[in-house]
Amino acid sequence: MSDFLKTMAKQSADRAAAAQLRPAELDLPVMPLSLGSFDVIAEIKNRSPSEGALASEALNRAEQAARYVEGGAAAISVLTEPTQFGGEIEHLAEVVNAVSPIPVMRKDFLVDPVQILQARAAGASGVLLIATMLSDAQMDEVLDQFKGYGKQPTAAQ
């Protein structure tokens, strides 16, 4: 794994450890993964480590997501990683509230099942996993989390 991915995995694990959500504390409904078709997944991304700021601080993520849907996006991806990409879990909830029932996914460097629970609590329909960041044990734990929601995960390397 690259040094960048190692750093991102460590920071993500630290955020997961700080999370207070637990499955027994939340009664989450089953969310659809798609609306029956798939064309484009549009992305809300504030910053890039290589490009710097991609959006102004004044960006209204809800309005941007609604414009993506009006333009034909079948789903919206929201980058929630805070240190390198300027994202927050709250951004995910904003977008979900703006475009429901359009599927919205959390894009982050996820390493712990609690982070999937956070995504579900924010209303996400799915998450992106980076398989090369996860040990076999972590991948099994995360995939078991999906199955616990009655979902069949799709994974590719």
Where are these regions (language model features)?
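Short, conserved beta-strand edge motifs with alternating hydrophobic and charged residues
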Residues: L129-I130, T154-Q157
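Active-site-proximal glycine-rich helix-loop-beta segment
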Residues: G72, A122-S125
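Catalytic cores of alpha/beta
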Residues: V111-G123
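Short, conserved, surface-exposed binding loops centered on an aromatic residue
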Residues: R120-A121, D144-Q145, Q157
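Conserved N-terminal beta1-alpha1 strand-loop-helix module at the mouth
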Residues: M1-V104, V111-V114, D136, Q145-A155
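Bateman (tandem CBS) regulatory domains
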Residues: A98, S125-G126
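Gly/Pro- and small hydrophobic-enriched strand-loop and loop-to-helix capping segments
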Residues: V127-D136
